[in-house]
């Protein structure tokens, strides 16, 4: 899974309820503790910038447990891993930006607890930091294997810059890479590694790769794409353990009665939202930190955005938790607007992307919402769009090397269309708007 991969979806299928957003706090500026942001991912970086763009002049503090300023995660499994993108270009903004905007960016700072009554954040070093408003942007962490040999050297997970630096270094000498998990993150890494000349195997326990996030037709397309580049894609294959060398390095991946040689393993089997701080503080959680349509939690002064939040989507008509950069960025803007006294609702059509080899896949909505598929373009030429309709209206698209179709679908989302015209490449999609 693009897990950020660029995205994954977890839905609780609960109806959207209307909620009230309380008015912004009113107190003298000299008495204001300011706004604290826990987490230093892309959403957190956007939030800090948005607060200054909103004209907020109080203290803004970002607390991040990594050694880096806010950065983009999507390139990690693609251009950064391949070496095509330098570290500085992974950063959301140059480090100088935060000082220039009087934003207190604290890296290597892990938060130990929250006290929503006292309105303080306590770091692992024991420092108490007061806040008027708090944003939780703690993201997620990789789900880990707990099986025989899973602690051997050479078994990696991909989530952070440090993770990718370790993988990139290992790839310099590795010959046989096994990727456990056939989601977007795993497939993106497979494309980088295969291009670099490694022998690559992808192991997926489900019937097909990408089973949780797309249709059988798209799974088959990407299966063929990877096998055509020499990747050994094995579905219906679960991992039972790992065996190692005498010095504790991984040597084989065990799959029941069979084994696969490996001197490097990357595991991508999903993520776990980082909600423990909120849970322990008594904030409502259910498959994420529960927020309303203003990105506000059950505590009036605490907001949550990104991977860790479970939000209502009025367009889809249900609650869901998204692992998606566009979602985190837009939620950051909405939450900050509301923190600053506006009344702004988060209502966006989800969209995602994945880069594999020379193909860019761009997605709008969820294919599982459709009851009809309409193909436009030529799959054999690696340039097509698969539209998904429900009761004649567009609810999703998977666009491969078809940016125009992707952009048009954003505008056509939810609208009734003529399926025959949609499928005809001679028909200008703008005529359907």
Protein language model regions, located:
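Mid-to-C-terminal Rossmann-like scaffold of FAD/NAD(P)H-dependent oxidoreductases
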Residues: 30-34, 53, 308-407
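Beta1-alpha1 glycine-rich phosphate/pyrophosphate-binding loop at the start
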Residues: 31-104, 192-213, 408
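Catalytic nucleophile loop
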Residues: 41-44, 183-186, 336
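A Rossmann-like FAD-binding core segment of flavoenzymes
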Residues: 57, 99, 105-123, 129, ...
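Glycine-rich dinucleotide-binding loop and its adjacent helix/turn
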Residues: 138-196
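FAD-site-proximal beta/loop scaffold in flavoenzymes
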Residues: 151-173, 244-334
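Cysteine/selenocysteine-centered motifs that mediate thiol-based redox chemistry or coordinate metal-sulfur cofactors
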Residues: 167, 419-433
